[in-house]
Amino acid sequence: MAVTRMLAELTVPLGGQRIELQEIDYGTGGMPLLRIRIREGRRFTVFEIDAQSARKWAEEMLAWSRKSQ
């Protein structure tokens, strides 16, 4: 059985999308995953990604954020 731990929740100011970041541990000796859950009205988009992919995504978002300020 998977164990889920909430890491962060935020609302995007433009558009009002709700974003949740959760750590998922499936408990079968596998690696933990990061679940990114985006709610837009009644629609959900869900990604489950590994630590390496999360790091690359975070680095790209941070680089863009720094350029755009």
Regions found by a protein language model. Name each.
Residues 1-69:
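Positively charged, low-complexity terminal tracts
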